[in-house]
């Protein structure tokens, strides 16, 4: 399991005062970088060999600016050319968001 600490930015909040739903995709992409490096250690975009086929999020609790979040990432399934990742966002030790992403290696 991979773990990444992220400090939410004020610009990631919305009018309701919590982190905007669009922000999670950015956080999950950052959390996937170590996995990308397994396929492309130098992250050379001209030799990129992964494509996202699916992504879904479940928003369980609000996340707020000013408190660090922990993003945990794990490989949950491996197929012939694809693999599934599970992401989880925790703030103050509470699971706030879970996500599933399917990447295809070509």
Which residues does each PLM region occupy?
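Hot-dog-fold acyl-thioester-processing enzymes
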Residues: 1-54
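HotDog/MaoC-like acyl-thioester-processing domains
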Residues: 1-4, 54, 59, 63-65, ...
